[in-house]
From Swiss-Prot:
It comes from Thiobacillus denitrificans (strain ATCC 25259 / T1). One of its GO terms (biological process) is regulation of division septum assembly. The keyword Cell cycle applies. Signal peptide: none annotated. Pfam families: MinE. This is Cell division topological specificity factor. Prevents the cell division inhibition by proteins MinC and MinD at internal division sites while permitting inhibition at polar sites. This ensures cell division at the proper site by restricting the formation of a division septum at the midpoint of the long axis of the cell. InterPro entries: MinE, MinE_sf. Belongs to the MinE family. The keyword Electron transport does not apply. Keywords: Cell cycle, Cell division.
Length: 84
């Protein structure tokens, strides 16, 4: 390895650069397409798991997705029955 390659780095082939870019584009599109599609399944899973431990009404669990700045936040609200 020459000292020039240490300074400027190894030159990548155009095919490998194109492949990396395509992988990034595909990953970004997958995230964009499935953004809110998973929420109903997540809600069903939460109902199933919580129902193992506490008797709840499935309508008492609300799942939402909201954007806060650069982040997407999953908000989960669960109304639990009063414990005696």
């Amino acid at each position: 390895m020459s000292w020039l390659s240490l300074i400027f780095g190894e030159k990548k082939s155009t095919a490998s650069v194109a492949k990396e870019r395509l992988q990034l584009i595909i990953a970004h599109e997958r995230v964009g397409l499935s953004g809110r599609d998973f929420l109903p399944d997540l809600q069903k899973d939460l109902v199933a798991v919580i129902s193992k431990y506490v008797k709840i009404d499935p309508d008492d669990i609300k799942v939402g997705l909201e954007k806060q700045g650069n982040y997407e936040v999953i908000e989960v609200n669960i109304v639990l029955p009063e414990m005696r």
